[in-house]
Amino acid sequence: MSASIPDIKLSSGHLMPSIGFGCWKLANATAGEQVYQAIKAGYRLFDGAEDYGNEKEVGDGVKRAIDEGLVKREEIFLTSKLWNNYHDPKNVETALNKTLADLKVDYVDLFLIHFPIAFKFVPIEEKYPPGFYCGDGNNFVYEDVPILETWKALEKLVAAGKIKSIGVSNFPGALLLDLLRGATIKPAVLQVEHHPYLQQPKLIEFAQKAGVTITAYSSFGPQSFVEMNQGRALNTPTLFAHDTIKAIAAKYNKTPAEVLLRWAAQRGIAVIPKSNLPERLVQNRSFNTFDLTKEDFEEIAKLDIGLRFNDPWDWDNIPIFV
């Protein structure tokens, strides 16, 4: 999709850029301009979600670039994610239609189940995005919807032409295995938290052997969660200042961010970093201009402590990763 960014061929047959622009926490006031500038900088994959609450603005940025002739729709790869309140098969298309309307497109390139958790349905007109709201104050209310039922609804939307590829996010290996057994269309992508503090080699090996492409979020470790004042992140040394990462970066005359992205890429993993700085956008794209050595990988492997920053156990003791 971009001459300077390698593509990954998904099991669905579609091509996905190996690096994209993450839209989590993009402010509504600036999201449209940031997406537009990222397109000008050569980015073609935009990773969003219903829950991020900024799909209208992301759509504005994409539409502006298309209207100005910078890109065609088919050159842009749009990812969105089905939020927890819409897992019931009768509500899946309702949620997707809202995403399509906000993004101002008639299909998304990739649609993921955001979490393997089903909350009570909340009508769009009542609250959107609902976040953790389940229609009962601050209480979590769950629905008994098996993942495979939600998946079958997504498969129908692929057949309808509203989605090109489908996948999952924040799934452990056992749930992914169960889904692979029952799916007619196999999940094309598994998006997970992935950084040197949480390397998940067994999950990645299993998924890749099954033909499922891995996309990493939070490639810079605690960075995004420090901005949210999360305790675990605040008490964790930043990877940008870690001696191991700094030493490798100095060896190649690269930034720590480039090293972290290249480390993931050499594991066959797509990445979706975000930056507010134009020069960083360009820097991050250069992640494929150098190679880490076996020794570099061995040093980074020593940083793995199984430290997860995005854990639904923190929400309501939801046992996805226990």
From Swiss-Prot:
Positions that bind substrate: H114
Any Pfam family the entry gives: Aldo_ket_red
Effect of S275A: Decreases affinity for NAD and NADP
Residues engaged in binding NAD(+): 169-170, 218-227, 274-284
Top class in the EC scheme: oxidoreductase
Top-level lineage group: Eukaryota
Active-site residues, as the UniProt record annotates them: Y52 (proton donor)
GO biological process: D-xylose catabolic process
Alphabetically ordered keywords of this record: Carbohydrate metabolism, NAD, NADP, Oxidoreductase, Xylose metabolism
Site note Lowers pKa of active site Tyr, residues: K81
MF GO annotations: D-xylose reductase (NADPH) activity
Catalytic reaction list: xylitol + NAD(+) = D-xylose + NADH + H(+); xylitol + NADP(+) = D-xylose + NADPH + H(+)
Effect of R280H: Increases affinity for NAD
CDD domains: AKR_AKR2B1-10 (cd19113)
TM stretches of this protein: none
Function: Reduces D-xylose into xylitol. Has a preference for NADPH, but can also utilize NADH as cosubstrate.
Subunit relationships: Homodimer.
UniProt record similarity statement: Belongs to the aldo/keto reductase family.
Protein name per the record: NAD(P)H-dependent D-xylose reductase
Gene encoding the protein: XYL1
